[in-house]
């Protein structure tokens, strides 16, 4: 009985463990980036031939002491390497992990190699040579603390190298990751039932090839010409055992029935590459390949009358100018799954979970966080069996909303007000193509909540009820409201997010409330923004400031723009879109500065010299900077006592120092827009005028129809130097 360790990418361990169990492995133990198991020599070779998800199969030889380099050398020297490798043979070593005395994997590998060749030279009179490519024996050393484990790499090189991929495109999908995506989408079971498979953005063809190999019961190692066990001398009968396994795999392949598998890409060059790879995999005739746009896909006339499986890996859109294109691409994919392929299982690997919202699917998918090489990705599954735990990223329902007692009469009263508001705003929303707006804001005293629309999502903010209203009554009214929202607004219940807005103390209006990560991509005036619907009190996009952002965009051309207390940088994006010469965004929060940078990159704005992001206390920064600007947006918090600040900040108390200090940064003919959401705010007109400032209140000009309420949600002034 041997002990083995099969390595794989993080996140794929469940698929690998299930695979090994099906092969007959014993004591299967999932670990980080791999799975331990036990079995005879046959199970090790079978894993090399049949594992679609493993990267390497390591046969464990011995635990050793690696507390010092000398201990490592001495321990390895005790192993009878002459029984594993000829003196005239070649070897290579891999060292994974470090400790306090072996601080670099290259050093650990060197000590391992020295001990092996010294042992063989002492026993045989000559020593093996080192070969980096396809050695006779590849030795693996894993270090954890003072303990190491030495093993033989039976695979020899990564098992993802199936042998069929001649060429690839950008960010190619590793073959073992592709196989895991298919496992997670349930393709193996569906293929046995005769379900069809589609990949409408197949790139170099990895997913359809892996789908065909899985459906056709083709051993993923059958095309490989090299394995690490081929010239390993540590066991007898390997050649005969391997031949038997190979013959068995051919018999299994001959008995399998291949379902319909179709793939395509809009890029003619990628279709050509995919065709060459399909031929190299000996699968021509089994995969139908098309040059076709995602929007052009329809069900084939000969497809079985049953739902199939779609798995795809769309482009990641990391280059400038691709973001808008990608949003359209994901929208087309969503239309395909909502239309011709309605009811199909699907798995979509995306470079950013934000793209999920662009697909417009009625249900929130299960999410898995995976990596395609160095690129972090989200794998979104629809129509598959739910996992024991909710997928990361799915909004957790607020307790009681699904099962509470609802008063039909009260609920209808709230529904009528929603319909009235929708009717009032409909022309404006349609004419201006408004995607994010406020539909309701405590318009009825009984229902103290705000309802905001973010494209196909709805966010409900329940205001904290006065102490005179019992909690049970407030909760019952929330039940009433939420019971009618999906039907009136035409959204599924899963796309209604409920939060409670309490009186904020200091900077905690920006503190994290949850960690569900429900991020959505929304559009405003042709620009794209990331919003987080669940984790913070505010989403990252203030709907009430939409007119102010439009004004900034209209006035930014050839101007130097400053955004103080920049939050998620939405005003900065508008300024850049308006042609600002430079933009500077200042905030004390790393979280929001990084968010602001993502928003800029979403819209194709990069360049650290043209667009600067500064982490600083804004009050201190304006007092020390020598920069000047033509256009400034100042939207400070009402109050802040962040732990990163030495003193608290109060907009009513500190307005003269703040506004005066910011106005000092204005160039001649420059404009400062100051906005505040503080209720009962009183501008110190006389004190500011004494600083030679001219102030014009423009509050009504900065409110769209969805915020025409009294008192206004914010007040705003246009300030210039007199």
UniProtKB/Swiss-Prot annotation:
Residues 43-154 form the THUMP domain. Its main location: cytoplasm. SMART domains: THUMP. It is found in: Cytoplasm. CDD domains: AdoMet_MTases, THUMP_AdoMetMT. It is an enzyme of class 2 (transferase). Keywords: Cytoplasm, Methyltransferase, RNA-binding, rRNA processing, S-adenosyl-L-methionine, Transferase. GO terms for cellular component: cytoplasm. Its EC number is 2.1.1.173, 2.1.1.264. Belongs to the methyltransferase superfamily. RlmKL family. Specifically methylates the guanine in position 2445 (m2G2445) and the guanine in position 2069 (m7G2069) of 23S rRNA. This is Ribosomal RNA large subunit methyltransferase K/L.
């Amino acid at each position: 009985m041997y002990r083995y360790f099969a390595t794989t990418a993080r996140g794929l361990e469940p698929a690998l463990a299930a695979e090994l169990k099906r092969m007959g492995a014993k004591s299967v133990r999932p670990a980080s980036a791999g799975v331990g198991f036990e079995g005879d020599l046959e199970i090790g070779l079978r894993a090399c031939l049949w594992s679609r998800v493993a990267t390497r199969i390591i046969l464990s030889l011995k635990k050793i002491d690696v507390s010092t380099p000398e201990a490592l050398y001495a321990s390895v020297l005790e192993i009878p390497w002459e029984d594993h490798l000829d003196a005239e043979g070649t070897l290579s070593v891999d060292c994974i992990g470090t400790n306090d005395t072996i601080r670099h994997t290259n050093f650990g590998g060197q000590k391992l190699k020295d001990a092996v060749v010294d042992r063989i030279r002492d026993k045989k009179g000559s020593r093996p040579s080192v070969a980096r490519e396809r050695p006779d024996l590849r030795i693996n050393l894993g270090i954890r603390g003072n303990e190491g484990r030495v093993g033989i790499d039976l695979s020899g090189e990564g098992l993802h190298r199936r042998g069929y991929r001649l060429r690839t495109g950008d960010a190619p999908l590793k073959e073992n990751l592709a196989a895991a995506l298919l496992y997670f989408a349930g393709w193996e079971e569906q293929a046995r039932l005769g379900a069809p498979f589609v990949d409408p953005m197949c790139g170099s063809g990895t997913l359809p090839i892996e789908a065909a190999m899985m459906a056709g019961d083709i051993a993923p190692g059958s095309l490989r010409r090299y394995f690490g066990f081929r010239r390993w001398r540590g066991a007898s009968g390997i050649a005969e055992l391997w031949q038997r396994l190979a013959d068995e795999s051919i018999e299994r392949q001959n008995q399998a029935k291949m379902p319909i598998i179709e793939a395509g890409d809009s890029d003619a060059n990628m279709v050509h590459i995919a065709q060459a790879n399909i031929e190299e995999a000996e699968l021509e005739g089994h995969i139908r390949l098309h040059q076709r746009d995602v929007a052009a896909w329809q069900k084939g006339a000969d497809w079985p009358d049953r739902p199939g499986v779609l798995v795809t890996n769309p482009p990641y859109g990391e280059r400038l100018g691709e973001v808008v294109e990608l949003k359209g691409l994901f929208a087309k994919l969503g239309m395909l799954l909502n239309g011709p392929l309605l009811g199909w299982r699907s798995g979509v690997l995306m470079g950013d979970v934000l793209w999920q919202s662009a697909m417009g699917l009625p249900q929130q998918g299960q999410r898995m966080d995976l990596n395609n090489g160095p690129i972090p990705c989200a794998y979104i599954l629809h129509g598959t069996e739910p996992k024991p735990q909710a997928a990361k990223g799915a909004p957790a329902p607020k307790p009681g909303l699904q099962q509470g007692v609802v008063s039909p009469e009260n609920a209808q009263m709230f529904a009528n007000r929603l319909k009235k508001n929708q009717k009032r705003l409909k022309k404006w929303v349609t004419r201006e193509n408004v995607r994010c707006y406020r539909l309701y804001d405590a318009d009825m005293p009984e229902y103290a909540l705000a309802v905001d629309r973010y494209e196909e999502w709805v966010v409900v903010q329940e205001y904290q009820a006065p102490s005179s209203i019992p909690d049970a009554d407030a909760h019952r009214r929330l039940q009433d409201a939420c019971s009618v929202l999906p039907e009136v607004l035409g959204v599924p219940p899963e796309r209604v997010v409920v939060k409670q807005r309490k009186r904020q103390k200091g900077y905690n209006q920006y503190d994290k409330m949850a960690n569900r990560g429900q991020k959505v991509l929304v559009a405003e005036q042709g620009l794209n923004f990331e919003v987080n619907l669940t984790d913070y009190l505010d989403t990252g996009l203030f709907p009430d400031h939409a007119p102010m952002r439009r004004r900034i965009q209209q006035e930014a051309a050839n101007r130097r723009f400053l955004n103080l207390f920049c939050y998620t940088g939405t005003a900065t994006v508008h300024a850049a879109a308006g042609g600002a010469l430079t933009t500077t965004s200042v905030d004390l929060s790393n979280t929001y500065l990084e968010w602001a940078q993502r928003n800029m990159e979403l819209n194709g704005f990069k360049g650290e010299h043209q667009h600067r992001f500064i982490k600083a206390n804004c009050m201190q920064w304006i007092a020390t900077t020598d920069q000047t600007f033509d256009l400034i947006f100042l939207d400070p918090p009402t109050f802040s006592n962040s732990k990163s600040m030495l003193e608290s900040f109060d907009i009513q108390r500190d307005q003269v120092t703040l506004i005066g200090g910011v106005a000092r940064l204005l160039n001649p003919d420059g404009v400062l827009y100051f906005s505040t959401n503080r209720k009962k705010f009183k501008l110190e007109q006389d004190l500011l005028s004494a600083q030679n400032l001219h102030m014009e209140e423009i509050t009504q000009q900065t409110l769209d129809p969805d915020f025409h309420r009294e008192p206004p949600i914010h007040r705003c002034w246009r300030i210039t130097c007199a």
